[in-house]
Swiss-Prot record:
InterPro entries: Pantoate_hydroxy_MeTrfase (IPR003700), Pyrv/PenolPyrv_kinase-like_dom (IPR015813), Pyrv_kinase-like_dom_sf (IPR040442). Its main location: cytoplasm. Pfam families: Pantoate_transf. It catalyses: 3-methyl-2-oxobutanoate + (6R)-5,10-methylene-5,6,7,8-tetrahydrofolate + H2O = 2-dehydropantoate + (6S)-5,6,7,8-tetrahydrofolate. One of its GO terms (biological process) is pantothenate biosynthetic process. The gene is panB. The keyword Ribonucleoprotein does not apply. This is 3-methyl-2-oxobutanoate hydroxymethyltransferase.
């Protein structure tokens, strides 16, 4: 696999499907690197890594720390950093934090949530040499305000709003869009309406690529599994089995053996 760039992602529109998963540290970044196109250092780490109820508590310092770690482990995959809640509520703050993310984390692009109301912010970042991935549909940073995680596009008005958002972000300079929690037929319409790749999560198959949280898809989270997640491994049970066997060997004097001693 050749090194993935913002330019090569844009060229995948209507061509090869784009693959993206989250990554939060160097260890897993090395395992994922080159297997997928994009490693997203998502603010989802607040939940899957930090045990929070939603993504809102995490800040810029933590995002940069984890992204630096991912960049140390990734050589081929494109690394994208999420702009956390409160880091881009004004255009000036967005530019300051995006520049900081670029300079300190090593990421190749930033991702931020919001539709047409964030168009001017995205345009400002793009004008200053920052590659931006948009995020519309279900926006996790808005769940408290919206009262939970709700599928979008069920009503005609919502569908038209999503189309307007996608077009506005395309015109503002995003190189790709994440479309989350959107009815499949509406997601297909959105993907067809713009020239940039649309990467879905819980938005059906008729888009330009897919993204999942790694701990969901590899079975490390044993709680609620969303409908859109496919488990490719039962990671939690494998890890627990290994730890259990280690503890048993120690207690019964089988570890370390003579071969494992100096």
């Amino acid at each position: 696999m050749k090194n993935i760039t913002v330019s090569s992602i844009k060229k995948k529109k209507n061509q090869e499907k784009i693959t993206m998963i989250t990554a939060y540290d160097a260890l897993f970044a090395r395992l994922f690197d080159g297997e997928v196109d994009i490693l997203l250092v998502g603010d989802s780490l607040a939940m899957s890594f930090g045990g929070e109820e939603d993504t809102l508590p995490i800040g810029m310092d933590e995002m940069i720390y984890h992204t630096k770690a991912v960049c140390r482990g990734a050589e081929k995959s494109l690394v994208v950093i999420d702009m956390p809640f409160g880091s881009y509520d004004t255009k000036e703050k967005a530019l300051h934090n995006a520049i900081r993310a670029y300079k300190e984390s090593g990421a190749s692009a930033v991702k931020l949530e919001g539709g047409i109301q964030k168009a001017e912010t995205i345009a400002l970042l793009s004008e200053n040499g920052i590659a931006v991935m948009g995020h519309i549909g279900l926006k996790p940073q808005f769940v408290r305000a919206e009262g939970g995680y709700k599928v979008k596009g069920k009503e005609e008005g919502e569908a038209q709003s999503l189309l307007r958002d996608a077009k506005a972000l395309e015109e503002s300079g995003v190189f790709a869009l994440v479309l989350e929690g959107v009815k499949a037929e509406v997601a297909q319409e959105v993907a067809r309406s713009v020239s940039v790749p649309v990467i879905g999560i819980g938005s059906g198959s008729q888009v330009d690529g897919q993204v999942l949280v790694w701990s969901d898809m590899l079975g490390f989270f044993e709680g609620f599994t969303p409908k859109f997640v496919r488990r490719y491994l039962e990671g939690a049970s494998l890890i627990r089995q290994g730890v259990r066997e280690y503890a048993k060997d120690v207690r019964e004097g089988r570890f370390p053996s003579e071969a494992e001693s100096y």
